[in-house]
Amino acid sequence: MEGKVLQILGPVVDVEFEGDIPAINEALYVEFEAEGEKKKVVLEVAAQIGDHIVRTIAMDLTDGLTRGEKVVATGAPIKVPVGEAVLGRIFNVTGDVIDGGEEVPADTPRWSIHRDAPPFEEQSTKMEVFETGIKVVDLLCPYMKGGKTGLFGGAGVGKTVIIMELIHNVAYKHSGYSVFAGVGERTREGNDLYHEMKESGVLDKVALCYGQMNEPPGCRNRVAMTGLTMAEYFRDEEGRDVLMFIDNIFRFAQAGAEMSALLGRIPSAVGYQPTLATEMGKLQERITSTKKGSITSIQAVYVPADDLTDPAPASVFAHLDSTTVLNRKIAEKGIYPAVDPLDSTSRILDPQIVGEEHYRVARGVQEVLQKYKDLQDIIAILGMDELSEEDKLTVARARKIEKFLSQPFFVAKVFTGADGRYVELDKTIAGFKEILEGKVDDLPENAFYMVGDLDEAKEKAEKMKAQS
C-alpha cells in the first residue's frame, strides 16, 4: 500500500492514501534525498483524520522531507529484533543497530513494540525479594521480583553507578540478562555508559536501546517500548528473570506530552497529555512476573523542580513497589552507594514477606539512624560531651551503621582500585543485627567503612589494631 506526503509539521506528517488506509500504530516509511544524502524515516500512524488521510508521528528528523514524496505502508507495527543477538549491542527505536558494528543476523526474530500485558491467569502473584547484593538496598528497601523500583536522585549522586552495579550483580549471581532503555537522556551519558560497561565487562549481558534528547518526541516516547519488547522476549520465550532499566521515565511522559500537543489534543493539568495515566499504565502493566519468568524494572525518575505532585512523576508513583532515594549529603560524606536509609521505602518490607527477623533489624536500623538525626542539632551546638550515656551509645552505633551501609562496587574498581563485594541477604541481616545488639561496640567505626559483610569489618579492625 502506497500513499503520498500531504503536509509536514515538524515531527507530524499527514499522508494521503487511495483506497484503504493503514491502521493505528502501523509503521510506514518514506525514503527521500536531503542534501545529497539518502534518508529513510519511519512514521507511525497516530490518527485517521478522514478523506483517506492519516496523521503520523515521525521516528526521526523530517528535515528535507517534501510534500508529494512516496510513502510505503508496511502492514505491521514497528518490529524490533529480539533474542540473544541483541545482547552487547545498541539499537534505536526502530531496532536498527547504531553502535557502528555489523547488522544483526537476518534470521533474528522480530517482535512488534505494541504488545498487550500478560493475561491475569499467566501472571504470578508470588511476592519474592529480588536479592541485589547491595546491603542498603536489600535491608531497607528490598526490590520485588517482577516489581518496579523508582530511583530518585539529582545529577552526580551515583544513579548510573548503581544501575551498572545491578547489571553486574544480576549477571554474576543470577546469570541473568538486562535491558537498558535510554529515554530522552543526554547522548554523552549514553556513550559513557556503553564504554563503562565495556570496561567493567558487563556489556555482553545487556541490550541497549537509545532515544536521546535531540531526537523527535515519537522516538523518545516509543524507545521505552522497544527496550521492553526485548525484555519480554527473554521472559516469555526463554523463561528468564530480566532486569529492565529505564532512564528516565519522566522523559517518556514528557515526549508523550509533546506528541499529544502536536496532534492537536486538548492538554490537561500542567500541559500534559489527557491520556498520561493510560499511556503510563500501558507501559507499566507490561512489566510484571509471569509463571515463566519475570521483568524487574528500575526506573530513574527525574522530578521537575523537585515537585513530587507534578502529574508526570505522580503518574509513576502509582505503579512503584519500592523507591531508592539517593541523597547528596550522604555522597558528600563519602558514603557510596549514597542511598538515603530513612527516605527509601519498599512495599515488601513486611514481616509476612521478608520474615520477622529481617523486618525487625531493618526497623531497628532506621530507628537508630532517626535518633542520631534528631540529636545532630544538639551535637552541633553543645558537642558530644553533653549527651547522656545512652545517647552517646546510640550515636556511636548509628555512625557504625552509616559506615556499614557503604560498600565497594565491582564496577567502581576502575576508580577506587578496591574489589567489589556482593553481600548475601542473610549476612547483611546478621551483620546489622550484631551492631544493634552492641556486640561490636568495641570496634573502631572506620573498620565498618567500605567493607562487605561483618566478618570483613572485624578483620579490618584487627589489622588497624596491629598497625597501631
From Swiss-Prot:
Give the matching Pfam families.
Answer: ATP-synt_ab, ATP-synt_ab_N, ATP-synt_VA_C
Organism field: Nautilia profundicola (strain ATCC BAA-1463 / DSM 18972 / AmH)
State the reactions this protein catalyses.
Answer: ATP + H2O + 4 H(+)(in) = ADP + phosphate + 5 H(+)(out)
User: Which is one Gene Ontology cellular component term of this protein?
Assistant: proton-transporting ATP synthase complex
What superkingdom does the record give? Bacteria
Compartment annotation: Cell inner membrane
Q: NCBIfam families, per this entry?
A: atpD
Q: What is its EC number?
A: 7.1.2.2
List the protein's name.
ATP synthase subunit beta
